[in-house]
Regions:
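Short, intrinsically disordered terminal segments enriched in charged and Pro/Gly residues
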Residues: 1-24, 70-121
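Short cysteine-rich clusters marking metal-coordination/redox-active sites
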Residues: 30-33, 59
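Short, flexible, mixed-charge glycine/proline-rich loop motifs
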Residues: 16-27, 47-53
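Short, non-ligating residues that shape and space the ligands of small metal-coordination modules
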Residues: 39-40, 68-69
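Short linear interaction motifs
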Residues: 11, 40-42
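N-terminal single-stranded DNA-binding subdomain of primase/primase-helicase replication proteins
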Residues: 33-37, 44
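Cysteine-rich micro-motifs
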Residues: 51-66
Length: 121
């Protein structure tokens, strides 16, 4: 399985500057390799007993990634077709990052992802 490396801080900044994932969930340009292969997956969770969201952004071409956890913004609704498709695998999602991203890539290539995101304020 291919190991992933992290986007550099300047690449993460470029990802945030060049894209608004909440408006468009399609793949976009990777600041590292130049391929249109950057994908994002959001997962609802709880952190300190409060609603939270885990965000993973990765490039399917050069295998760079970034992840973060933060509070779930009020009014943000995230569909999670993976959870509906395979609840057992979804529960074990973070046991191995290489397996996680391989699984997310398969779901993307099979048309299960990207997710839909609705933000009502």
């Amino acid at each position: 399985m291919i190991q992933l490396t992290r986007f550099t801080p300047s690449e993460v900044e470029a990802l945030g500057r060049d894209r608004n994932f909440l408006r468009d969930q399609s793949e976009w340009l990777c600041p590292s390799c130049g391929e249109v292969s950057v994908r994002t997956y959001l997962r609802n969770t709880k952190h300190a007993n409060r609603p939270a969201v885990i965000s993973y952004t990765w490039c399917a071409a050069c295998r760079k990634m970034s992840g973060s956890t933060g509070p779930l913004p009020p009014g943000l609704t995230i569909s999670d077709p993976w959870r509906e498709l395979d609840p057992a695998a979804w529960e074990q999602f973070d046991t191995s990052l290489p397996r996680l991203f391989a699984r997310l890539d398969r779901l993307w290539e099979d048309g299960v992802l990207p997710q839909s995101v609705v933000w009502t304020r």
